[in-house]
Curated annotation (Swiss-Prot):
Component of the periplasmic nitrate reductase NapAB complex composed of NapA and NapB. InterPro entries: Asp_de-COase-like_dom_sf (IPR009010), CT_Nitrate-R-NapA-like (IPR041957), MoPterin_dinucl-bd_dom (IPR006657), Mopterin_OxRdtase (IPR006656), Mopterin_OxRdtase_4Fe-4S_dom (IPR006963), MopterinOxRdtase_cofactor_BS (IPR027467), Periplasm_NO3_reductase_lsu (IPR010051), Prok_molybdopt-oxidoreductase (IPR050123). This is Periplasmic nitrate reductase. Pfam families: Molybdop_Fe4S4, Molybdopterin, Molydop_binding. One of its GO terms (molecular function) is molybdopterin cofactor binding. One of its GO terms (cellular component) is periplasmic space.
């Protein structure tokens, strides 16, 4: 190395460093020494990628050096985050480098042989897949297609979810595949489909800068979507007329910005929503022209139960459970009469929210001069009537015509980076196919079979086991070979003690978990497969505003870790068609005889038609190199053919590597910001102004839906409500964020947030250890009475990121009967001193 020379500019830098270091109490020699280094030693390669965390869809710039991610920063060219990152985003460079990163397949063994009660032992990929294939074939032989299943993720890349759905629905001929988005977004999907006949929001993030009012329903955006919250905050503080209303069952950081803050009793949001609709009607503020031209009215089925096991008393007495999604036609007058019982005065009594605040909230919606954006997340969706909540907030926007235009938008925010792009759009749910198609519709199945080049009748016509039902079927021994990818359901799933863990350890079952780290779920499995993360593979995510984003592989995965996509496709080689399809199906397409599932599904002349030389020069692509063709482009273009031409259009593959994402539908190279509005959405017919084209009549549905009580409420034995959720420092189960030292130290363990008066009454002090116990289980946690979250009396809040405090041992596995999404926000507990 040549002797470093210091010029005048560098000398000034050194002097400045010395002054700054002295002020901070830092040793100046070490600080200054880092400023003079050869250029070659500091050169970094920068590239764009979508953030690995929430559904906001921030773009980040990623720096790599020596095959390692060494830095990240917010992408200043990105429309979504405009150069900003949240606290988690700032530490993205560290998520892949935890000390316990998995690098080899691990199989439970005793004496060199697989043993469900054995110790995890490193094995080769060949041995791992050989044992796994044997167990899947045994399950198929024993129970047919219903004996195998998969639990996937809203963190799958688009092509991973597509390949997985294809493998199970077409290859194994089972719809027993579901994403963990069932726990977070299923009610939003069902709400959109019921109201509009098509999924995903009408608006986009640009609404933030155009609106006059924000209403947050069960959404702590300040912590869960902090980058969007910065945009909301900027709009509120820079435009004095703008108002912010926040509704929640406890006070949180989003209340700091609220002009109208409302803490309501759990489940009474249903009552408040109907009361607002009644206020709009009774004060004469219905947009009659809009309602007449663009809506019809429906009365929904009532008494629909709580998605519990059929033998549960609540299910037995639910008269409408078997037809939960049904609805009948009614008139506007009948709807108006229905909601007339829901007055703001009654809503105040029911909810505990002061009447003047409910009136202020209702006026934001009713005033025709006020543009309104409604945001919601898990407070609505993780709800035994979550679909109804979605429908009811759409009612309000439709009654006033405040929809599908800049600043007027009902908007469900997503929690995972590709809950929209992969779970919803690809259709990895147990009842869905790509582009809003469903397995119960013969025309949809026929189209999928045509695109996938399958014989008629390949795809089953009944929905498979959804997330909660998968756990029940595993426990009952009816689902015997099970593959989990990119989620931690033993920590995340409800009622884990009684319904989830027993199925994992059922001796009749073989459980495979693909993960980058030894999560709670991985450690309960029989086989662990080490997985490539984030920029260790080429990827694509779709965010909450319909924005699809791509990134290149930037570094290699450690050891023998492989991507979920590689695992899915490589595993498919272990099955001949004769292993999985009946003879009568094979006879319809004799040319598949003797071929593997890999040949039929992925080497089918479509997925494999793009050669390796189409990969952009300068980037690695481990999966494509392994299979001999550009896998990602082939899968994407085949998948995109489902949606092009009917409102789900995606741009050509290459466009996404050039852009910071595009919002679909993308027609003739132009993205769509506001759907259903003439002049913005290319699918709206000229002269209609607004067209909700998800339904043949072009009209949205306004639903009459009542208040119904929760599945479980506090009583003398369990006197507190329990609500669970997240904190800004950690993401979901903490598998990644708890391995980042700075984030771990910032919030090292979950606590039980409690009202000070409740604590005092129980003779508890801040920091005391307590049991949080329900009828299903308990955890131990320390009491927090002065934290950021401030529950009202009678409610406690416990985050679920901490694997040492598995709060989902306590929660109830009740679901919305329509969406089958779990309610993590309402169950009854008691608090006991340890």
């Amino acid at each position: 190395m040549t002797e470093p020379k210091i010029d005048r500019r560098q000398l000034l830098k050194l002097e400045a460093a010395a002054i700054a270091a002295a002020a901070a109490g830092m040793p100046t020699v070490a600080r200054a020494a880092n400023l003079v280094t050869e250029r070659e030693a500091t050169e970094l390669k920068w590239d764009k990628a979508a953030c690995r965390f929430c559904g906001t869809g921030c773009s980040v710039m990623v720096a790599t050096k020596d095959n390692r991610v060494v830095a990240t920063h917010g992408d200043i060219k990105a429309e979504v985050n405009r150069g900003l990152n949240c606290v988690k985003g700032y530490f993205l460079s560290k998520i892949m480098y935890g000390h316990d990163r998995l690098t080899h397949p691990m199989l439970r063994k005793t004496g060199g042989q697989y043993d469900k009660n054995g110790e995890f032992t490193p094995v080769s990929w060949d041995e791992a897949f050989d044992v796994m294939a044997l167990k899947f074939k045994d399950a198929l032989k024993k129970r047919g297609p219903s004996g195998v299943g998969m639990f996937g993720s809203g963190q799958w890349t688009i092509w991973e979810g597509y390949a997985a759905s294809k493998l199970f629905k077409a290859g194994f001929r089972t719809n027993n595949i579901d994403p963990n988005a069932r726990h977070c977004m299923a009610s939003a999907v069902a709400g959109m489909m019921r109201t509009f006949g098509i999924d995903e929001p009408a608006g986009c993030y640009d609404d933030i800068e155009a609106t006059d009012a924000f209403v947050l329903w069960g959404s702590n955006m300040a912590e869960m979507h902090p980058i969007l919250w910065t945009r909301v905050t900027d709009r509120r503080l820079s435009a004095p007329h703008v108002k912010v209303a926040v509704l929640s069952t406890f006070e949180h950081r989003s209340f700091d910005l609220a002009d109208v803050g409302m803490v309501f009793k759990p489940q009474t949001d249903l009552y408040i929503l109907n009361a607002i609709a009644n206020h709009i009607i009774s004060t004469g503020r219905v947009n009659k022209d809009f309602v007449s031209a663009h809506t019809v009215f429906k009365k929904g089925q009532t008494d629909i139960g709580y998605g519990l096991r059929p033998e549960h008393p609540l299910q037995k007495k639910a008269t409408g459970a078997a037809k939960a999604n049904d609805a009948t036609d009614i008139s506007f007058d009948e709807y108006a009469k229905f909601v007339s019982d829901y007055t703001l005065e009654k809503a105040a009594d029911m909810s505990g929210v002061p009447l003047n605040r409910l009136q202020a909230l209702a006026e934001l919606y009713a005033d025709p001069k006020t543009k309104v954006v409604s945001f919601w997340t898990m407070g609505f969706n993780q709800h035994t009537r979550g679909v109804w909540c979605n429908n009811l907030v759409y009612n309000i926007h439709l009654l006033t015509g405040k929809i599908a235009e800049a600043g007027n938008s009902p908007f469900s925010l997503t929690g995972q980076p590709s809950a929209c792009g992969t779970a919803r759009e690809v259709g990895t749910f147990s009842h869905r196919l790509p582009a809003d198609m469903v397995v119960t519709n013969k025309e949809h199945r026929t189209k999928a079979e045509h695109i996938w080049q399958l014989p008629e009748g390949t795809i089953p016509d009944k929905p498979g086991y959804h997330a909660v039902l998968q756990s029940r079927m595993l426990k009952d021994g009816l689902l015997n070979a099970y593959w989990v990818q990119v989620n931690n359901n033993l920590q995340a799933g409800p009622n884990a003690n009684e319904e989830t863990y027993p199925g994992f350890r059922n001796p009749d079952n073989f459980i495979v978990v693909s993960d980058a780290y030894p999560s709670v779920t991985a450690l309960a499995a029989d086989l662990i497969l080490p997985t490539a993360m984030w920029v260790e593979k080429e990827g694509a995510y779709g965010n909450a505003e319909r924005r699809t984003q791509f990134w290149h592989q930037l570094v290699s995965a450690p050891g023998e870790a492989r991507s979920d996509l590689w695992q899915l496709m490589e595993f498919s080689k272990r099955f001949k068609i004769e292993d999985v399809w009946p003879e009568e199906l094979i006879a319809k397409k004799p040319d598949v005889r003797g071929k593997t599932l890999f040949d039929v599904l992925y080497k089918n002349g479509q997925v494999d038609k793009f050669p390796l030389d189409q990969i952009e020069p300068g980037y690695a692509n481990d999966e494509s190199k392994a299979f001999g063709f550009y896998v990602h482009k082939g899968l994407f273009e085949e998948y995109a053919s489902f949606g092009r031409g009917h409102g789900h259009d995606l741009a050509p593959f290459e466009a996404y590597h050039k852009e910071r994402g595009l919002r679909w539908p993308v027609v003739d190279g132009k993205e769509t910001r506001w759907r259903f509005r003439e002049g913005s959405d290319p699918y709206v017919k000229a002269g209609t102004g607004v067209q909700f084209y998800g339904f043949p009549d072009g009209k949205a549905r306004i639903f009459a839906l009542p208040y119904e009580p929760p599945a479980e409420s506090p009583d003398k034995d369990y006197p507190f409500w329990l609500s669970t959720g997240r904190v800004v420092e950690h993401w979901h189960s903490g598998t990644m964020t708890r391995r980042v030292p700075e984030l771990y130290k910032a919030f090292p363990e979950a606590v039980c947030f409690m009202h000070p008066d409740d604590a005092q009454e129980a003779n508890l002090r801040r920091g005391d250890e307590v049991k949080v116990a329900s009828r299903r289980g308990f955890i131990r946690a320390r009491v927090e009475t002065r934290g950021r979250d401030k529950p009202p009396r009678g409610l406690v809040f416990v985050p679920w990121f901490d694997e040492s405090k598995l709060i989902n041992k306590v929660t109830l596995d009740a679901t919305d009967p329509i969406s089958l999404q779990t309610d993590y926000k309402k169950c009854a507990v008691r608090i006991e001193r340890v």
